């Protein structure tokens, strides 16, 4: 698992860690998923193993972590690693990766909204953590590599700015989108967040 170094570090510091492969990811079954499945998984884990003190999410999982923490899985802190504040950032990057034109990108966004049975205002209200930030008593850690090509850092910077003094920003160099998970700076920052008096 890409989270293995972080899990080891947290456990060595005495934390109990619940890690899972999201639906249709890693060793989990399924061929397709959307953000609702990730949030359902977080809710089930919270009910069985919670309450949690920190939720850590990477990439799309970071958006799911933010959404869960803002709605049905309240926690004292969230760590967002190589993530984004809203679905639009992922849709835009997917379109850029495939060199989609504006009309095709618009159809992709519309299909996403139809799948969720929501219009744009409902998607924003439910999933945009800049326009609808975390609760005021929830701390935020944002970690992003400056050279991340799979999910550039501009949306993470918006997320950090939207949360003011309760957000800590850690920017790495040369780690990219995946290796950032095991970077020393990331591990140290997540441990510090989990051990902070606000959280414990």
Describe each region flagged by the PLM.
Residues 1, 7-29:
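Conserved alpha/beta-hydrolase
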Residues 30-53:
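Alpha/beta-hydrolase active-site loop
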Residues 56-65:
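Gly/Ala-rich beta-loop-alpha elbow adjacent to hydrolase catalytic centers
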Residues 72-119:
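Hydrolase active-site cap/lid region
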Residues 114-133:
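Active-site nucleophile elbow and catalytic-triad environment of alpha/beta-hydrolase enzymes
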Residues 133-137, 142-144, 148:
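Short beta-strand/loop motif that positions the catalytic acidic residue
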Residues 149-155:
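Conserved alpha/beta-hydrolase "acid-adjacent" motif
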Residues 175-185:
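Catalytic histidine-centered segment of alpha/beta-hydrolase-like enzymes
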């Amino acid at each position: 698992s890409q989270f293995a170094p972080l899990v080891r570090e947290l456990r060595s510091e005495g934390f109990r860690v619940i890690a899972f492969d999201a639906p249709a990811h890693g060793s989990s079954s399924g061929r397709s998923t959307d953000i609702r499945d990730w949030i359902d998984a977080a809710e089930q884990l919270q009910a069985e193993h919670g309450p949690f003190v920190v939720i850590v999410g990477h990439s799309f999982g970071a958006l799911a972590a933010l959404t869960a923490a803002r709605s049905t899985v309240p926690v004292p802190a969230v760590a967002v690693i190589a993530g984004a504040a809203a679905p639009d950032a992922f849709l835009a990057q997917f379109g850029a990766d495939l060199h989609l034109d504006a009309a095709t990108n618009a159809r992709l966004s519309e299909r996403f909204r139809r799948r969720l049975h929501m219009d744009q205002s409902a998607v924003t209200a439910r999933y945009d953590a800049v326009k609808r930030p975390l609760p005021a008593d929830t701390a935020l850690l944002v970690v992003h590599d400056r050279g991340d090509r799979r999910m550039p850092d501009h949306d993470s910077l918006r997320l950090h700015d939207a949360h003011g003094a309760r957000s800590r920003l850690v920017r790495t160099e040369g780690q990219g989108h995946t290796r950032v998970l095991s970077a020393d700076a990331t591990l140290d920052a997540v441990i510090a967040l989990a051990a902070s008096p606000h959280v414990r």
